[in-house]
Amino acid sequence: MSLLHCENSCGSSQSESDCCAAMAASSCGTAAKDDSVSGTASTVTLSSSFMEEIQGYDVEFDPPLESKYECPICLMALREAVQTPCGHRFCKACIIKSIRDAGHKCPVDNEILLENQLFPDNFAKREILSLMVKCPNEGCLHKMELRHLEEHQAHCEFALMSCPQCQRPFQKCHLNIHILKECPRRQVPCENCAVSMAFEDKEIHEQNCPLANVICEYCNTMLIREQMPNHYDLDCPTAPVPCTFSAFGCHEKMQRNHLARHLQENTQSHMRMMAQAVQTLSLAVAPVPQCTMPLYDSVPPTRPSSGRHSEVHNFQETIQQLEGRLVRQDHQIRELTAKMETQSMYVNELKRTIRTLEDKVAEIEAQQCNGIYIWKIGNFGMHLKSQEEEKPVVIHSPGFYTGKPGYKLCMRLHLQLPSAQRCANYISLFVHTMQGEYDSHLPWPFQGTIRLTILDQSEAAVRQNHEEIMDAKPELLAFQRPTIPRNPKGFGYVTFMHLEALRQRTFIKDDTLLVRCEVSTRFDMGSLRREGFQPRSTDSGI
């Protein structure tokens, strides 16, 4: 049986009481409803407080827990104790899970047991909550009644908390000291340049900081690091330098403060090296042959410099032509840029107009539905693959109207992940109210009946659609007049249909799933009832 439910479509956690209420309603075979928040989360996930209640209280009691308060299933202290007609006590979540997984029988004596036969054992609950327990946090010696344990843990100085910088767990009483003095990711300033960095990066930074003090390896002078290259090249008196005449063949190297003495002592040898280099250069230059003909016989009749002047003149003309062409191209580029900007404005305006027209067409189409809308979800195989890969799958339908005038609604479909508690591998289906054209003329909150159907697309004469019907509950926020384009609160079924059931018939055809929504407001609810399909009541199973 599907669980009728209003859930938070943003994936936010429900409170402990909401989760328990939903489970209780499910165990009685009824549809539990609550508000839902629309968003992009992948599935409806159980809150952390509910997950803690899957089994009994796993705490150390002082004195030790009596066996009569132990759950026979989880062997822990009874949480939300319930009693069976055969007199056995169980955790509420444990026995419900046992009935659903192992069948309708008592795990102790195998007596027939239905969920609606369970009743709360408030006496045992009070007794257990009054028992003394030890704080589970290491180092804490506090004892308190079980009912106060959660409040104590929220303030216990020995509770573990993650460091916001390095993410390692520490007890709350030691966390501040760790953050300020011990955390390797704590921010510290460089003593030289005042740049802030993580403590674990400080050593590497100090090895490269441009303002850090360093000592010259030759003269032991202390300078900042960015001055050291110039010091080596120009100032250091003991840095090794080559002889000034190294280009002429002197390969001696000495300290800079010894260079002057070296030049003075080796003046003659340096002069010989220079003379030899000049002589070698002179021999490398070939002699100019003498002319044997008169000069006027070897020179053309034109002036010697006329050819050069002509070339220069041609170059000047070419440069002027290129400059003129460059100016014209610059003007053309500016004109084209201006035209492009104007056309871009026109294109953007056309896009806005097209979007407006598309919205109007969609609005007109939505108004023609008259309360019956068939949602075609294409590429459904891709959505199923994403669900198997634990990727979020949340899809919203276009808006549609219940009539003209009428309320504007939309549907939201979740594919619950395989890891989801209690609703793994289910299709969740919800309805949201939307801001519509006629909202100011309609009575609020919305009242009526909604039938949700996944259509069988087989060619059989009798098609077996999967459908559920629900009555609106005006007191819920899901049916109030929306104040934003889509009401964040939704109403529907967390476990509308199992994916395994989806594959057993031709619900998916041509990679398309068809979801039908039929809405009857309070003015035309008789149509559904004439068909003999009565909505489920939250009290029908009690």
Swiss-Prot record:
PROSITE patterns: MATH, ZF_RING_1, ZF_RING_2, ZF_TRAF. One of its GO terms (cellular component) is glutamatergic synapse. There is a cross-link at residues 125, 339 (Glycyl lysine isopeptide (Lys-Gly) (interchain with G-Cter in ubiquitin)). Residues 1-374 are annotated as: Interaction with TAX1BP1. Pfam families: TRAF-mep_MATH, TRAF6_Z2, zf-C3HC4_2, zf-TRAF. Pathway: Protein modification; protein ubiquitination. A zinc finger (RING-type) spans 71-110. A zinc finger (TRAF-type) spans 151-203, 204-260. Residues 310-368 form a coiled coil. There is a cross-link at residues 125, 143, 473 (Glycyl lysine isopeptide (Lys-Gly) (interchain with G-Cter in SUMO)). GO terms for molecular function: histone deacetylase binding; identical protein binding; protein kinase B binding; signaling adaptor activity; tumor necrosis factor receptor binding; ubiquitin conjugating enzyme binding; ubiquitin protein ligase activity; ubiquitin-protein transferase activity. Keywords: Coiled coil, Cytoplasm, DNA damage, Immunity, Isopeptide bond, Lipid droplet, Metal-binding, Nucleus, Osteopetrosis, Repeat, Transferase, Ubl conjugation, Ubl conjugation pathway, Zinc, Zinc-finger. The coiled coil domain mediates homo- and hetero-oligomerization. E3 ubiquitin ligase that, together with UBE2N and UBE2V1, mediates the synthesis of 'Lys-63'-linked-polyubiquitin chains conjugated to proteins, such as ECSIT, IKBKG, IRAK1, AKT1 and AKT2. Also mediates ubiquitination of free/unanchored polyubiquitin chain that leads to MAP3K7 activation. Leads to the activation of NF-kappa-B and JUN. Seems to also play a role in dendritic cells (DCs) maturation and/or activation. Represses c-Myb-mediated transactivation, in B-lymphocytes. This is TNF receptor-associated factor 6. The lineage of its organism: Eukaryota, Metazoa, Chordata, Craniata, Vertebrata. The gene is TRAF6.
